[in-house]
Amino acid sequence: MARKDRMSGNEAVSFAIRQINPDVMPAFPITPSTEIPQMVSTYIANGEIDTEFVPVESEHSAMSAAIGSEAAGARTLTATSSAGLALMWEELLLAASNLMPIALALVNRTLSGPININCDHSDGMGARDTGWIQIYAENNQEAYDNFIQAYPIAESAGVHLPIMICQDGFITSHAVENIELLEDEEVKNFVGEYEPEEFLLNPGKPIAVGPYSVTSYAMEAKKNQEIALENAKDAVLKVAKEFKKISGRSYGLFEEYKTKDADYIMLLIGSAAGTAKQAVDDLRAKGKKVGVIKLRLFRPFPADELATALKGAKAVAIMDRTESYNGNGGPLGSEVTAGLFRNKVMIDTVNYIYGLAGRDFTVQEVYDIFADLEDHIENGTKLEQFKYIGLR
């Protein structure tokens, strides 16, 4: 039977790790994810789990150790943020290309510079093309639920890819909210025992891990990795369906909030969805047909599904909490518009950059964005297709 508690996002993820009891956790601390390895090591010291905690000298070493333990057949995780993820860059690519279902608790924090420790999505989005599955949470409950689903997704047949479970630094990681926890036995049964198909410590079936791949074979290996990432989409939905049976909570590729008859939709990721939903409620009370799509799964990107969800709208605001520095828009803006075009969904889009380096995103700004979209459609007012909101 589920029980109610109050936890920060970091506490919630750490508690999920305690319930899963993975085999190995190499980690190096970095704000705002430091509490996760700290809390897990406390669980270990108290004898609550028997995870092997490996303190290392850097985040590069943390991911290197994670690759080694996963290759040996151990269920493995780590946690990091910002520059820590950037330092893992080389190893992120290796973990994915070797099809290793490592779980990474990513607490999103801006990348320098200027030096800043607050939230935006530049770290996760910077690693978007490394081959990892990426799932984002709006609140502490979702951070907890997503982490419990992480291994069943990553370890699914035909997938076997590493997975990032992302939450917004400080906004959810350190904020305390009411949360509903599953019983330990429920989580243990749901996640199951790890039974890797291939691993180094298997004398009956010797393998090589990460050997040099010549030109004659390397391209096929990359295509197989891409197929595995495509398969992850179905795995996310299948695992979510099973998770609902034990929790009563529904998850998908994204959440649609009051979009059924919406003329104007805001599409975004993470904790800002709560702000957008509040604004939508307020505007709906005034007769405005507006809605929100909160993207949960960013990798693999659900382009076709999003195009279907957006095709009835007159215009969409695509919100990026990061800057791609390409002069053309943020990551979400680029991917959504490409998906709409490929699916022949010709609606107006505006890509907004917001909330960089912890800048607050307000209900009033959501009002303003929807007002801009309506003015553009109803009165023909020209809008920039790529713009910042919330600048001083």
Where do the protein language model's features map onto the residues?
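Short acidic, glycine/serine/threonine-rich loops at helix termini
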Residues: 36-39, 65-67, 88-92, 113-119, ...
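Conserved thiamine diphosphate
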Residues: 118-162, 166-169, 345-359
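Peripheral docking tails and interdomain loops at the edges
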Residues: 320-392
